[in-house]
């Protein structure tokens, strides 16, 4: 008996020592990294008490009080409960098992999703209905690269003082000395401040231009004669020019970190913003490990809608980011204009390229060469001169000439890999870059430049090789008309894998070649040696689409200040304009369609979603009761609150478990039949009695039934329930993506449309 006890004691000691040795070995090989410890809803304790509680929790894992204080970087505590600390992986894992912790995840770097757009959307200046008094009380928080408050787009002439509800601050710093009555607040977040370029730290000033661009798209005042070096000349303005901007700088030269974004959300919610716009994204993660999903949930609890960019990794499927159903995820579509940069060859042939070339030619023709002919590499030298790689061309062969560069062959290569910088450094006169694939996105060039389609590039090569004295000229970019809207090639597509039965993106907005304000601290091309500065610039990305949707949300809120975030989002989705696009991606690329702000202020019916409904959805998605309780504060130390329990949630919530404005289902690849039921509740936001009749559009082979088919309302705020039953057989004609729709029509101008999309990934759906 004694012998067995000794053996057990020995084995216990051995395991403890062995685990300690393993941990020590890990510590030697792994550097401590910042982790975010998310603990749900903030308690009613003071920030000082919250920070001390975080320290005590960390100390239980670290085992040393002074070391714990050294390792803790930051505490959240205004609306979001949690902290950031430098941890080893095994310490993070141990913390994740502690009572009161929802999740522990590594701090990562995320990236920005980088004029006439409001006219294109129907908000023609002086010709659309506005509620200016209420609009001026709306505050949009922009989480981005900061702001240039000196831009004419943020002139506060005639603008009254900030709304009384505003609780934020203007934090001044280098190159940022003041706010005004338009930009009423500015803060910067860089919890780990090392590694910043000189002059960029400790300031909300925008050294990139991105934040100034997005902010002015939302609420910039009207500025006439705005252009980028004469390109796209016209009037620049925001969608809600009387609204206020609060700038939260979370993105720096190195990127945008999770911990900084979460800190900005915590501040913005407390400051009193009404809408949050964040054009940032990264890898898709479970909601409790996604800082944007976490921050947006806490914002939603305070009545704040968060608009997010869908991402720029298109056109492939499963590329969309920002997937939480409580955020509005925005795809990018085109305007009815494009930028054309014509190249003319010495033999009279022309090629229509794309760029933002603000240089007028000084000669009728320039000598033309190619990267291959301008090579300075000896036999066996490293590099590819045909694509104009740095270090492969000779100055004596480039000086004063236009250089043609073939398309790069790297994965995803599409030209534009700095060839303009290479050619300018060798005193070249211009650059023509061949594209592997067509693009709709125009970019600024350091010298005269144009990006031409692959076939045109081949003809240019043939011309160069056919004559002893090839010549070419690159004309200044001009604006031409095009059919629109269409989804931009870069815009990320669904479906998604985190919550497979929620359709993302939700909606689309202009994001291609958008003219808006720019920072005087940022170069036009992003090259450090580009000394040109401009008050306005043209940028593309879902980053540019997101602020259009944020402004549209603010516009709707100016007419309906008491509406919930979900109601505003529903109004924009159900009144959106469906799009026709090439291929079979359908709603996976544009969601419900392009925003139509004028229709959205009178949607007729809305699909509202409460906080409790989102919690039921999280239960259905498999998140545990304890974590959900912490998210809401129901599992806090407050003894008057009951613990949240998913077991008490009513079952039979339908195919998606949420009162979402769109209907989506990812079908198992082995299933030949489709059989789904969606339950929905609509709220009447129209005036007077009304009757709505359901209209269904569905392809052959798919039966879509709405029960009941008629709904009547006597007064505003009345609710009605209905269900949508979908049955069919998945045959070859349906391919992998099937689109349908349900529309509720009251014959008085209200048409409430919900797209239906079924997806099965085993087919060739392209």
Swiss-Prot record:
Kindly state which keywords UniProt assigns to this record, in alphabetical order: Autocatalytic cleavage, Glycoprotein, Hydrolase, Protease, Secreted, Serine protease, Signal, Zymogen
Q: What is its EC number?
A: 3.4.21.-
Domain PA: from-to ranges: 365-460
Where exactly are the transmembrane stretches of this chain?
Answer: none
Q: In what residue span(s) does the Inhibitor I9 domain sit? A: 35-113
Q: Which residues form the active site?
A: 144 (charge relay system), 210 (charge relay system), 543 (charge relay system)
Q: Which positions does UniProt annotate with glycan attachment?
A: 175, 233, 376, 465, 624, 638, 668
Q: Which GO terms describe its molecular function?
A: serine-type endopeptidase activity
What is the residue range of the signal peptide feature? 1-23
- Start and end of every Peptidase S8 domain? 117-601
PROSITE patterns with a match to the protein in the record: SUBTILASE (PS51892), SUBTILASE_SER (PS00138)
Q: Answer yes or no on keyword Hydrolase.
A: yes
A single Gene Ontology CC annotation of this entry is: extracellular region
Sequence similarity: Belongs to the peptidase S8 family.
Q: Please give the name of this protein.
A: Subtilisin-like protease SBT4.15
Q: Which organism is it from?
A: Arabidopsis thaliana (Mouse-ear cress)
The record lists the lineage as:
Eukaryota, Viridiplantae, Streptophyta, Embryophyta, Tracheophyta
Q: Which gene encodes it?
A: SBT4.15
């Amino acid at each position: 008996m004694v012998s067995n006890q000794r053996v057990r004691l020995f084995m216990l000691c051995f395991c403890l020592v062995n685990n300690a040795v393993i941990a020590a070995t890990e510590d030697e090989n792994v550097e401590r990294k910042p982790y975010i410890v998310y603990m749900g809803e903030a308690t009613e304790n003071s920030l000082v008490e919250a920070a001390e509680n975080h320290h005590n929790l960390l100390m239980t894992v670290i085992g040393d009080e002074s070391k714990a204080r050294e390792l803790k970087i930051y505490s959240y505590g205004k609306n979001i409960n949690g902290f950031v600390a430098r941890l080893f992986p095994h310490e993070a894992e141990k913390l994740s098992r502690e009572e009161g912790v929802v999740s522990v995840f590594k701090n990562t770097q995320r990236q920005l999703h980088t004029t006439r757009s409001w006219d294109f959307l129907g908000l023609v200046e002086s010709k659309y209905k506005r509620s200016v008094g209420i609009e001026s009380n709306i505050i949009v928080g922009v989480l981005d690269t900061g702001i240039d408050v000196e831009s004419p787009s943020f002139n506060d002439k005639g603008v009254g003082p900030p709304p009384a509800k505003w609780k934020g601050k203007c934090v001044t710093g280098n190159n940022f000395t003041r706010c005004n009555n338009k930009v009423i607040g500015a803060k910067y977040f860089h919890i780990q401040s090392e590694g910043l370029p000189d002059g960029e730290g400790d300031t909300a000033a925008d050294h990139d231009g991105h934040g100034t661009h997005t902010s002015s798209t939302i609420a910039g005042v009207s500025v006439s004669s705005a252009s980028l070096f004469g390109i796209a000349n016209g009037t620049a303005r925001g969608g809600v020019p009387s609204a206020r901007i609060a700038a939260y700088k979370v993105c720096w030269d190195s990127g945008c970190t999770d911990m900084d974004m979460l800190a900005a959300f915590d501040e913005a919610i407390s400051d009193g913003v009404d809408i949050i716009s964040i054009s940032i994204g990264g890898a898709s993660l479970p909601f409790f490990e996604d800082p944007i999903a976490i921050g947006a949930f806490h914002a939603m609890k305070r009545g704040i809608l968060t608009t997010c960019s869908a991402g720029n990794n298109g056109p492939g499927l499963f590329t969309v980011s920002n997937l939480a159903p409580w955020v509005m995820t925005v795809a990018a579509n085109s305007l009815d204009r494009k930028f054309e940069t014509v190249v003319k060859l010495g033999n009279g042939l022309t090629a229509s390229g794309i760029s933002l070339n603000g240089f007028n030619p000084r000669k009728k023709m320039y000598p033309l060469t190619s990267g291959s002919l301008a090579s300075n590499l000896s036999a066996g030298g490293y590099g590819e001169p045909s694509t104009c790689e740095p270090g492969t061309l000779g100055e004596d062969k480039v000086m004063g000439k236009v250089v043609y560069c073939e398309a790069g062959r790297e994965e995803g290569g599409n030209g534009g890999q700095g060839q303009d910088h290479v050619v300018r450094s060798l005193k070249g006169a211009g650059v023509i870059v061949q594209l592997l694939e067509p693009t709709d996105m125009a970019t600024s060039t350091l010298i005269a430049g144009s990006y031409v389609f692959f076939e045109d590039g081949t003809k240019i090569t043939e011309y160069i090789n056919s004559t002893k004295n090839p010549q070419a000229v690159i004309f200044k970019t001009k604006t031409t008309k095009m059919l629109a809207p269409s989804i931009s090639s870069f815009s990320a597509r669904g479906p998604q894998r985190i919550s497979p039965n929620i359709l993302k993106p939700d909606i689309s907005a202009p994001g291609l070649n958008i003219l808006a304000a720019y920072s005087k601290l940022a170069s036009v091309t992003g090259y450090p040696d580009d000394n040109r500065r401009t008050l306005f610039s043209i940028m593309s990305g879902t980053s540019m689409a997101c602020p259009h949707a944020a402004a549209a949300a603010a516009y709707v809120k100016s007419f309906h200040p008491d509406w919930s975030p979900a109601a505003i989002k529903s109004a924009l989705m159900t009144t959106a304009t469906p799009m026709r696009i090439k291929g079979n991606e359908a709603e996976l690329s544009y969601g419900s369609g392009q925003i139509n702000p004028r229709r959205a202020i009178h949607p007729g019916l809305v699909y509202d979603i409460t906080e409790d409904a989102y919690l039921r959805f999280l239960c259905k998605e498999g998140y545990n009761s304890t974590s959900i309780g912490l998210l809401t504060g129901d599992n806090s130390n407050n003894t008057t609150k009951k613990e949240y329990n998913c077991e008490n949630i009513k079952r039979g919530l339908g195919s998606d478990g949420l009162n979402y404005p769109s209907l989506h289902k990812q079908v198992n690849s082995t299933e030949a039949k489709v059989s789904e039921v969606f339950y929905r509740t609509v709220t009447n936001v129209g005036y007077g009695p009304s009757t709505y009749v359901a209209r269904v559009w569905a392809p052959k082979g798919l039966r879509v039934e709405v029960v009941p088919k008629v709904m009547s309302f006597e007064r505003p705020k009345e609710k009605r329930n209905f269900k949508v039953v979908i049955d069919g057989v998945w045959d070859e004609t349906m391919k992998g993506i099937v689109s349908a729709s349900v529309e509720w029509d009251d014959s008085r101008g209200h048409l409430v449309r919900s797209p239906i999309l079924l997806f099965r990934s085993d087919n060739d759906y392209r």
